[in-house]
Curated annotation (Swiss-Prot):
Subcellular location: Cell membrane
The protein's Enzyme Commission number: 2.3.2.27
The protein's name: U-box domain-containing protein 1
Entry comment on modification after translation: Phosphorylated by LYK3 in vitro. Phosphorylated by NORK/DMI2.
Quaternary structure and partners: Interacts with LYK3. Binds to NORK/DMI2.
GO molecular function: ubiquitin protein ligase activity
Enzymatic class: transferase
Effect the entry attributes to changing D308N: In pub1-1; abolished E3 ubiquitin ligase activity and slight reduction of the total root length. Increased and faster fungal colonization by R.irregularis
Main location: membrane
SUPFAM superfamilies, A to Z: ARM repeat, RING/U-box
Length: 694
């Protein structure tokens, strides 16, 4: 589609050559009588035409009355003439342009209709209806139109059905091998029934429709070459590849005497598609294509069926080949959670493997087809072809993500507030899953724009942006890029004064994620506001917010100079209070931070001054979690070493302390057993000194 803005710069102050009312009636009738509507933006087009038809009745009524027009009404009608003229141009552009490109530009075009409706409403603001010699019902209709236009100003309308079509289009493009098509018969992993449905929904039903759409995309690429930039032209070329490839598959010529048939007529007639010696790998590919794999059976890395599911130290399950490749490439974190892997052992998930086997049997999917070794050359050849197709599919998926990310970043950089809000939300979702997605989004330059928008006055933009940065930061390389973009001050700003609690909490989560890298711990700790802001959220946040703040403080406290800042911010007293609050729900996190702060003399002093802490720790030795018990015993041992007999006497005076320590020394974790033994030895030495009494 040509850029509508270039054709819509019509000055509202330029009077038509004919009389004003004649021109208004003429342009209104031209719009109302349009025969061909675009199949994208149909609701916005229909709504706009309905408004113009209603105004046309007003113009005709005024013309018939032959009464003089008040000056303010003339100004109003000049503005309306400009709006209707631009509506006509916009509808014509949508009709004549590429339907696919209109679908990709859904937000941008919807915003243009939105702007025109707002301008129509503002023009009607100055229309003196009471001074016009028209029927009462016309006045009421125009007044209703005015009120509706003012209501529309509050919210941009984007047809959810068209949003879904666009999502379906992106999904199809991610599954299509656009850049690596071969001349062989195995042309990727597309569900062509779904492709045909998408194309039909935007008006591509016949072979000529496909040919026309390709021509429109070619024209659009030429128009954008000078103004849209390489990214836009590349996106249009990708769309042309999709339509061309789909056309060749949706319409096939089975014989010289036969006409082209849509794929829905022969997709399930396998005898016409495959010859008798079709390979088993081909049937495997078809079965996988037509059967919907449950999400819980898909590997989070490859999104393929997990044929050999294994569990990593974080507790998440992956396909063995995918996670092994991930670890071997130098990563030491869980791809899904971002947690550091404490070991690289891969534990077979036999329960899930059994369920996958059962699902494969019930759905006629050959479980071991792609992994069974076979020495004959034919099987090897088909196995290699499957591997190539798999690589090609992954590349196509990455290309689709890159195209989407580039498009969204462009809207993020130049769009209106509404467009930026939608783009930030979509980047947030795109960055939520997959390390490749996070890497690609950063590579196309999203991070600097996201950092800038952290201080947006729009609460939703701020929330989406800080969450997107948190999601992106899960990929280790992005942590450096985010810090290099100067994000920390803006993130802290959101943490302190965020417009929503969710934004503040996600800012804390972002700091937690960034602080996993040692250099980032130093930079964050150097900010005079970061640690006090985290302590503030620890006090004011929800359970999730408190936990995010506590884990961020724990990470920062690992760097010794940060411990003093945490203590000075009043964290110790607050953490002890949270231990006493059953509803807070962050006992383990609070204990972990207190245990780390023992390594700082100021922290130790603050912890010693808490009179209620020791009884709490004794109770946690009995009822706490494994981690809670470990950190409780760490704190008690540290206090005993520092305070000596004073804390020892308090422990011995509590009848529950010795049984709890003995139980922990016998049945606790290795770390807890070791520290429980050390504490029992200290208490034993204290008891052996008879001159001390309880």
């Amino acid at each position: 589609m040509n850029d509508p803005r270039s054709k819509m710069m019509i000055s509202p102050g330029l009077l038509p050559t004919e009389s004003l009312l004649d021109s208004l009636i003429l342009i209104s009738n031209e719009v109302s009588s349009m025969q061909k509507f675009p199949l994208v933006q149909i609701k916005n087009v229909s709504s706009m035409i309905r408004r113009i038809k209603l105004l046309s009745s007003l113009f005709e009524e005024i013309q018939e009355s032959d009464s003089p027009l008040p000056p303010s009404s003339i100004l109003c009608f000049i503005e309306i003439f400009s709006v209707i003229t631009r509506v006509k141009v916009l509808i014509q552009e949508c009709t004549d342009g590429s339907s696919l490109w209109s679908l990709i530009q859904l937000d941008f075009i919807s915003n243009q209709f939105f702007v025109l409706v707002k301008e129509m409403g503002r023009a009607l603001d100055i229309l003196p209806l009471n001074l016009l010699n028209v029927a009462q019902d016309i006045k009421e209709q125009v007044d209703l139109l005015h009120k509706q236009s003012k209501r529309v100003e509050l919210e941009l309308f984007i047809d959810p059905r068209e949003v879904q079509r666009r999502e379906n289009l992106f999904e199809v493009m991610s599954k299509n091998c656009l850049q690596n098509k071969k001349t062989n018969n195995n042309k990727g992993f597309i569900d062509f029934v779904k492709v045909e449905e998408i194309m039909c929904s935007i008006g591509l039903r016949t072979l000529s429709d496909y040919v026309e759409e390709i021509s429109k995309l070619e024209v659009e690429a030429q128009n954008q070459a000078g103004t849209g930039g390489l990214i836009v032209v590349s996106n249009i070329n990708n769309l042309m590849s999709l339509v061309s490839y789909t056309k060749s598959m949706v319409f096939r010529n089975d014989g010289e005497s036969e006409e082209c048939k849509p794929i829905s007529m022969f997709l399930y007639n396998k005898s016409k598609i495959h010859d008798n010696d079709s390979s088993s790998s081909s049937s495997f590919s078809q079965s996988m294509m037509t059967v919907n794999i449950p999400d819980e059976f898909r590997c989070p890395i490859s999104l393929d069926l997990m044929r050999d599911p294994v569990i990593v130290s974080s507790g998440h399950t992956y396909d063995r080949i995918s996670i092994a490749e991930w670890i071997n490439s130098g990563h030491h974190t869980c791809p899904k959670s971002g947690q550091r892997l404490i070991h690289t052992a891969l534990i077979p998930n036999y329960a899930l493997k059994s369920l996958v086997h059962q699902w494969c049997y019930e759905n006629n999917v050959k479980m071991n087809e792609a992994i069974t070794k076979n020495n004959n050359s034919s099987s090897k050849r088909h196995k290699n072809e499957n591997a190539i197709d798999h690589i090609s599919e992954n590349k196509a998926s990455k290309d689709a993500v890159k195209m989407t990310a580039e498009f969204l970043v462009g809207k993020l950089a130049t769009g209106s507030t509404d467009i930026q809000r939608q783009s930030a939300y979509e980047i947030r979702l795109l960055a939520k899953t997959g390390m490749d997605n996070r890497r690609i989004i950063a590579e196309v330059g999203a991070i600097p724009f996201l950092v800038t928008l952290l201080v947006s006055k729009d609460s939703r933009i701020q929330e989406h942006v800080v969450t997107a940065l948190f999601n992106l930061s899960i990929y280790d390389n992005n942590k450096i890029l985010i810090m290099a973009a100067g994000a920390i001050d803006n993130i802290v700003e959101v943490l302190e004064f965020g417009k929503t609690m969710e934004a503040r909490e996600n800012a804390a989560a972002a700091i937690y994620s960034l602080s996993m890298i040692d250099d980032c711990k130093v930079q964050i700790g150097a900010s005079s506001r970061a640690i006090p802001a985290l302590v503030g959220l620890l006090k004011e946040g929800t359970i999730i917010g408190k936990r995010d703040a506590a884990t961020a403080l724990f990470n920062l406290a690992v760097y010794n100079p940060n411990k003093l800042s945490i203590v000075k911010s009043g964290a110790v007293t607050l953490l002890v209070e949270l231990l006493m609050d059953d509803k807070a729900g962050i006992t383990d996190d609070s204990l972990a931070v207190l245990a780390v702060l023992l390594g700082c003399s100021e922290g130790l002093e603050e912890i010693k001054n808490s009179k209620s802490l020791v009884p709490l720790l004794i109770d946690l030795l009995r009822f706490g979690s494994v981690k809670g018990k470990e950190n409780s015993i760490t704190l008690l041992l540290g206090l005993c070493k520092e305070e000596g007999e004073l804390v020892a006497m308090r422990l011995l005076a509590n009848p529950r302390s010795i049984p709890s320590l003995q139980s922990l020394a016998a049945d606790g974790s290795l770390r807890a057993r070791r520290k429980a033994d050390a504490l029992l030895r200290l208490l034993n030495r204290c008891c052996s000194q008879p001159h001390h009494s309880l």
